[in-house]
Amino acid sequence: MTGKFITFEGIDGAGKSTHLAWFAQQLQAKLAPLGKKVVVTREPGGTPLGERLREVLLHERMHLETEALLMFASRREHIAEVIQPALDAGDWVISDRFTDATFAYQGGGRGLAIDRLEALEHWVQQGLQPTKTILFDLAPEIAAARLADARTPDKFEAESAQFFLRTRAEYLRRAAAEPDRFVVLNANRERSDIQKDLENLLATL
């Protein structure tokens, strides 16, 4: 039995990471009687090499194509060392970001040609796609207000409002193009309301 691959997406400040922890806990309770486990991971990162690349990607300035290539290099290692082995074992994987983030941030935000990203996606993922992608949708100005007092921003969090408008637009474009894979949640609500939606989704998986 092959496991399932769930990804959480959204612009910085949308709240996806908070809800991911709760969702993973609920899913593990559901899978435990079946002898399966939930592997929680993130991108960029997820492996020792990926975590080192994460530090470079979040804090070092670089050419936009270099940035995209490093994202996919980290992803190849992540798939080979974490994601695919877990799925092959019948376990479930939940990742805080995956390739949709690269299309949204490097494609939408940075303006990198989508066809170049698609070529890298095809090479690196070899057909692997998430079973379901949960997109936490939030207006950039609200997300920025949430982040203002949270912590010192990394280079992506410090980007302009226009950058995040483009990033959000690309996320929504991808969601509209793949409605069977994406679940779009309004992230500008109370936590309990969002968790209710996630609970309903969990029942369908």
Curated annotation (Swiss-Prot):
Keyword terms of this UniProt record: ATP-binding, Kinase, Nucleotide biosynthesis, Nucleotide-binding, Transferase
GO terms of molecular function: ATP binding; dTMP kinase activity
InterPro entries per record: P-loop_NTPase, Thymidylate_kin-like_dom, Thymidylate_kinase
One GO term of the biological process aspect: dTTP biosynthetic process
Keyword presence, Ribonucleoprotein: no
GO cellular component terms attached to this protein's record: cytosol
EC number of the protein: 2.7.4.9
Pfam family for this entry, one: Thymidylate_kin
Catalytic function, reaction form: dTMP + ATP = dTDP + ADP
Residues given in the record as ATP binding sites: G10, I11, D12, G13, A14, G15, K16, S17
Enzyme class: transferase
Family note: Belongs to the thymidylate kinase family.
HAMAP family found in the cross-reference section: Thymidylate_kinase
Role, per record: Phosphorylation of dTMP to form dTDP in both de novo and salvage pathways of dTTP synthesis.
Protein name: Thymidylate kinase
Organism of derivation: Ralstonia pickettii (strain 12J)
